[in-house]
Amino acid sequence: MRIALFSDIHANAEALTACLDHARANEVDRYVFLGDYVGYGADPKFVVDTVQAHVSRGAIAVRGNHDDAIETGTDQMTESAARAIAWTRGQLTPSQRTFLRGLPLSASEADRLYVHANVDAPAGWDYITDLYTASRSLIAMRAHIALCGHIHVPALYHMSPTGKVASFEPIGGIDIPLSRHRRWLAVLGAVGQPRDGDSAACYAILDDARETLTYMRVPYDIDSAARKIRAAGLPARLADRLYAGR
């Protein structure tokens, strides 16, 4: 089975559409969404509707911190993020908010764990940024691979049978073999607001038959997404950063 994995879409309809089209062209069998469907971007209704439609057809979706902030507040967010959440609250319908509120923090199937931020304390929204923070998740997990997002930068960590943790930066389009002798923690980057210096949307395909993970980079219409952000009256920085991938 080929599983398409998407995280941090952030109300970017153009990026999500491009990634879904790319995934279909690569003949995926299953879709998994790892949170942060709203915030920053100008198309929250489209993105939530799209994710909800996929869930109704059997896809998995978990909740991210921006989705959570729609109901719980923005005390821990930057000013621009908080402004985007406040605007988003006025865009979503009651049923869309109910959908987001009802999503789980994590989900699992077979030997895979799906979560937005981390494995060891998913409700705390701590970031995985280095070997130490990755090791906490790798120790806490029992699955062969955990897949998450949250930091908007693609990364891959693994733990050996002796407990040694290592990492490397994945290259887009290159199949990565997932040795059964290791535990794996894959950080998927972002569909809707990449921050690794590459403006192309990022998602991944997990092939459980071949036991490979492939990060994908997909160009999309940034001009359209940025124009909508400005037209909505959201902070201009949220539009500008799409071009820089930062």
Regions found by a protein language model. Give the residues of each.
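Active-site-proximal beta-strand elements of phosphoester/diester hydrolases
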Residues: 2-10, 111-118, 185-189
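Core catalytic region of metal-dependent phosphoesterases/phosphodiesterases
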Residues: 2-6, 11-99
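Short, conserved loop/helix-junction motifs that constitute active-site signature segments
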Residues: 53-56, 139, 178-180, 206
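Active-site environment of divalent metal-dependent phosphoester hydrolases
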Residues: 10-15, 39-41, 66-71, 108, ...
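Acidic, His/Gly-rich catalytic cores of divalent-metal-dependent hydrolytic chemistry
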Residues: 161-246
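Hydrophobic/aromatic beta-strand patches that form the interior of the parallel beta-sheet core
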Residues: 32, 60-62, 115, 147, ...
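His/acidic metal-ligating clusters that form di-metal
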Residues: 27, 91-159
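Charged helix-capping and loop-helix junction motifs
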Residues: 45-47, 128-135, 168-169
